[in-house]
């Protein structure tokens, strides 16, 4: 087969395949996972480092659905000051990280409107096993009596929902 004929066949094949490829969508319009969403938002860079250090990336990339109450970098900075730790020391303590991070994850996809609809005060059980409380103003009280406010809500991921919070939640001691 000569070169000109091959070029024509290749062009026709590509033209015939184009509508099929467009119908499939190039994948660019798919929502990211929870980890992908957090990785793409500079407010959550410390959270992403912590999730990675704790070995929870695969879990939070899983099918879910999950709701993550995601502490911002400012929330982590405040916690480090409160505990007198460096970020490196926190990231090295995987048992502590896993305990704290799983306390921020709730099974199911809860939008802010779902949380608002819960009878108040609402006790929300986390995948860590302990619960935190949400009041009528959507303020969260953790297991140690510390309060967090929602900074941003309903960030949608392919496997759940993320709500940014201004405080790292701590589970009950013990």
Q: Which residue ranges define each predicted feature?
A:
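Mature, structured domains of secreted/extracytosolic soluble proteins
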Residues: 3-10, 15, 20-174
């Amino acid at each position: 087969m000569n070169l000109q004929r091959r070029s024509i066949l290749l062009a026709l094949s590509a033209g015939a395949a184009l509508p099929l490829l467009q119908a499939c969508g190039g994948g660019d319009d798919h929502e990211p996972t929870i980890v992908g969403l957090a990785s793409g938002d500079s407010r959550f860079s410390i959270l992403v480092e912590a999730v990675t250090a704790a070995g929870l990336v695969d879990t939070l990339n899983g099918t879910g659905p999950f709701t993550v109450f995601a502490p911002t970098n400012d929330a982590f900075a405040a916690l480090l000051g409160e505990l007198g730790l460096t970020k490196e020391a926190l990231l090295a303590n995987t048992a502590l990280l896993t305990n704290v991070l799983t306390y921020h994850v709730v099974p199911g996809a809860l939008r802010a409107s779902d949380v608002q609809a819960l009878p108040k005060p609402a006790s929300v059980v986390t995948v860590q096993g302990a619960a935190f409380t949400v009041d009528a103003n959507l303020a969260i009280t953790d297991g140690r009596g510390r309060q967090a406010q929602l900074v941003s809500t309903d960030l949608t991921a392919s496997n759940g929902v993320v709500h940014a919070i201004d405080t790292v939640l701590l589970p009950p001691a013990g």
